[in-house]
């Protein structure tokens, strides 16, 4: 039986963590793993590559593709609301499946979201891609 794996990352922009995630998704054994990537925003240079290789769930659509001014305003409100809302509520709203492994692929919000998972049986991993001593902004996410 395949292991169900969830990766959580804020976007698929052109950073190093996004490239590493894309490489993992492209090369992981699909006979052993069923991969889902959850992003806050559906944006970045790796979106198409990820969509070809696994399930991609995005909390918000691609802002660039919104043409209606009201939709753009709603997007901005929803974006701010996601970061202010209780992570357990956000998790419950967007993560509908049960996963064997849940991986926060960057520090910060993704880590808080995975830590808020209601699934007690999943293995949870926080994959940190920065030097936390030099990145003081990350302090608020850790004890």
Regions found by a protein language model. Name each.
Residues 15-23:
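A conserved mid-protein helix/loop that constitutes part of the nucleotide-sugar donor-binding site
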Residues 69-101, 140:
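An amphipathic, basic-hydrophobic alpha-helix
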Residues 7-14, 27, 31-79:
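N-terminal strand-loop element at the rim of the active site
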Residues 17-18, 47, 112-115, 136-137:
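Short glycine-/acidic-enriched loop or helix-start segments at secondary-structure transitions
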Residues 86-88, 94, 101-121, 133-135:
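An aromatic- and histidine-rich active-site surface loop
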Residues 94-96, 125-143:
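A conserved, positively charged/aromatic
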Residues 2-6:
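Extreme N-terminal starter segment of soluble prokaryotic enzymes
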């Amino acid at each position: 039986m395949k292991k169900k794996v969830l990766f959580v990352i804020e976007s698929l922009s052109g950073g190093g963590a996004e490239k590493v995630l894309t490489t993992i998704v492209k090369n992981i054994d699909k006979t052993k793993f069923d991969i889902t990537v959850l992003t806050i925003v559906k944006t970045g240079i790796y979106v198409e590559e990820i969509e070809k290789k696994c399930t991609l769930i995005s909390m918000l659509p691609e802002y660039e593709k919104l043409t209606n001014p009201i939709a753009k305003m709603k997007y901005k409100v929803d974006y701010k609301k996601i970061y202010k809302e209780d992570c357990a509520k956000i998790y419950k709203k967007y993560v509908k499946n049960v996963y064997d492994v849940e991986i926060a692929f960057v520090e910060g919000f993704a880590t808080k979201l995975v830590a808020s998972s209601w699934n007690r049986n999943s293995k949870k991993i926080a994959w940190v891609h920065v030097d936390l001593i030099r990145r003081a902004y990350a302090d608020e996410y850790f004890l």
